[in-house]
Regions:
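Alpha-helical transmembrane segments and their immediate juxtamembrane cytosolic regions
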Residues: 2-413
Length: 413
């Protein structure tokens, strides 16, 4: 196992099956959460489409094995840049992975109770483990081949020689899938050892879930306790890697906190409390939206000061870590409020929701090839990113909708 400084682009969710709706509020809730997961998938596509044109993207590489290895996060680097993409990428990076771990946890407890640990893990191995193997073995080399081409080299043989000599092989966005599978394994083992642990967690969160401010405070301080010590010990951009398994070292416990809190909210009753359509969170969406913007601005200001500060690195590291967790929680609460309050069934959004997992799995290869194809185009960074984003969304959506017509594929993704 090794540790790398690669600032990998963070990514997304399990897309577990939603429970069968039993009443109108449950139907509306399922629509809201399903649409929110699909929306974050779209944010992931926009995030990756913009990275080639990020103002601080690294210089084009000369070899896949050259150090530092920044190409896993930036497979293609364009000469065209736009400063606004630093805001988009920074905003996404503060919250969307954490929110997706929270959403992934919502239905875990009911699934464990219904299936038991064995059947639950078999289902997760099928829905998460198998796609990860395919993504790491097939889709990742396809996505990173343009990085090799940008070095000026040609030919699959040369690419393969450099690829197998790496020692650690990035799986692209699929890193999220294996981490989620690991978290599911933790939940299943706990269920075998302590069968009521989710119910206890649900009872602890039941009252705070009806008071969004209280729940927000719990989320901030629990995640800060998990994140800040790790960020002080490890560089916040550091990734631990072994083989095809990557995870962001300082955030792994932070993500686990969001996942476990999601389990607790799901155990407490997903259609009531925090995520009720007529609840306090949904009714207060304007305040949460404004608070999210303020918290992100505060986190950005602290980050700028912290990276230029010459003194008190632990103080600024602590402040930076706290404002990160503050912004993360505020943005997550804001998007939950907006979707629970306003999401209504639409056929096109239903299609996006149904195909979102597959879109997530295959989009990275499409992004990198479109970025590579546009390298010599006489277009601005904004124009290129827009073409890459819309092209990736359309192509991946069409492709997944087509292959999901095969029943076995539809059961998998």
């Amino acid at each position: 196992m090794s540790v790398t400084q690669t600032p990998f682009a963070p990514l997304r969710n399990e897309y577990a099956s939603l429970p069968e709706p039993g009443n109108t509020s449950q139907i509306q809730y399922n629509v809201a959460i399903g649409y929110l997961r699909a929306f974050v998938t779209v944010l992931v596509l926009a995030h990756h489409a913009a990275l080639a044109y990020h103002p601080f993207a690294p210089a084009p590489l000369t070899s896949l094995i050259a150090e530092p290895r920044l190409w896993p996060a930036f497979p293609v680097v364009d000469a065209q840049r736009w400063s606004g993409f630093s805001v988009l990428v920074g905003f996404n990076d503060t919250f969307f992975m954490s929110l997706m771990f929270f959403l992934s946890g919502l239905f875990v407890w009911k699934s464990l109770q219904r299936k038991g640990s064995g059947a639950f893990l078999r289902n997760r191995m099928f829905r998460l483990g198998l796609p990860f193997v395919v993504a790491a073995a097939c889709l990742a080399p396809l996505a990173y081949y343009p990085a090799y081409l940008q070095t000026g080299h040609q030919g699959l043989a040369g690419f393969w020689l450099q690829w197998i000599s790496l020692g650690n092989w990035p799986a692209g966005p699929a890193w999220f899938v294996w981490v989620l599978l690991a978290f599911d394994c933790i939940a299943a083992v706990l269920f075998m050892l302590i069968p009521k642990w989710g119910d206890v967690l649900g009872r602890l969160l039941s009252r705070p879930s009806r008071r969004p401010i209280t729940f927000f405070a719990i989320l901030v301080f629990a995640s800060a306790a998990a994140y800040i010590p790790m960020a002080l010990v490890f560089n916040p951009f550091r990734w631990t890697v072994f083989g095809p398994f990557f995870f962001q070292t300082s955030r792994i416990l932070h993500y686990l906190v969001y996942f476990l809190i999601g389990i607790g909210i799901g155990a407490a009753s997903v259609e009531r409390g925090l995520l009720a359509r007529d609840g306090k969170l949904a009714r207060g969406w304007p305040l949460w939206a404004g608070g999210a913007l303020f918290a992100f601005g505060l986190a950005g200001a602290v980050f700028i000061v912290a990276i230029s500060a010459q003194n008190s690195p632990y103080l600024w590291g602590t402040l930076g870590g706290f404002t990160f967790t503050l912004s993360c929680a505020a943005s997550s609460m804001a998007f939950l409020a907006l979707f629970v309050r306003f999401a209504k069934p639409r056929k096109i959004f239903d299609s996006l929701r149904e195909n979102a997992y597959g879109i997530y799995l295959i989009h990275y290869a499409i992004v990198s090839w479109l970025q590579y194809a546009l390298l010599k185009a006489q277009l601005s960074a904004i124009e290129k990113a827009f073409i890459v984003f819309t092209g990736t969304l359309a192509l991946s959506w069409i492709a997944i909708a087509a292959i999901r017509r095969v029943p076995a594929v539809a059961r998998l993704i």
